[in-house]
């Protein structure tokens, strides 16, 4: 939690290696602005991670139901509900669950669609799963999402100004 400049000094130049990732500068609407409530938010098995711009209006109702089903929450945010909802339809490998296999594999995009049918509110989301590496699912409802296309890369943001230093080629998700 804190300013981007603070993160840069915290990692001390030790930038993680990888081919995909998500992050979010959060405007706190649910839960205090602290490291526990900082994005991305994981599911119970640290498989699915979600960043979210918006407000989930029915998060309390959804969270109560998920708690009764045995989900464990670590934050006070509405966002964490999303990772647990998606987990119901895209469980981590070896954990069982109610996912509908497609071609013998769980399908992250279909899990997101199923989960979001239960959600009321405005959102711009970026979702990744360790069990489906290299893929970022971006989805929106009444909140902006822009995708920047660069040299061998795609960048998802809620505002074009966040990515214009990387690319001038942007597509607004409808």
Language-model features: where?
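Conserved short alpha-helical segments that host acidic/polar catalytic motifs at enzyme active sites
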Residues: 1-174
């Amino acid at each position: 939690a804190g300013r981007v400049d603070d993160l840069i000094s915290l990692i001390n130049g030790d930038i993680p290696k990888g081919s995909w990732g998500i992050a979010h500068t959060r405007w706190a609407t649910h839960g205090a602005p602290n490291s526990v409530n900082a994005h991305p938010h994981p599911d119970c098995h640290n498989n699915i991670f979600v960043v979210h711009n918006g407000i989930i209006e029915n998060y309390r109702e959804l969270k109560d139901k998920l708690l009764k089903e045995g989900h464990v929450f670590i934050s006070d945010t509405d966002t964490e509900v999303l990772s647990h909802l998606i987990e119901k339809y895209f469980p981590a490998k070896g954990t069982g669950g109610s996912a509908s296999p497609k071609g013998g594999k769980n399908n992250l995009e279909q899990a997101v669609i199923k989960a979001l049918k239960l959600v009321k509110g405005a959102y711009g989301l970026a979702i990744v799963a360790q069990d489906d590496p290299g893929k970022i699912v971006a989805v929106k409802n009444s909140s902006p999402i822009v995708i920047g296309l660069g040299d061998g890369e795609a960048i998802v943001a809620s505002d074009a100004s966040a990515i214009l230093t990387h690319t001038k080629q942007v597509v607004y998700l409808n």
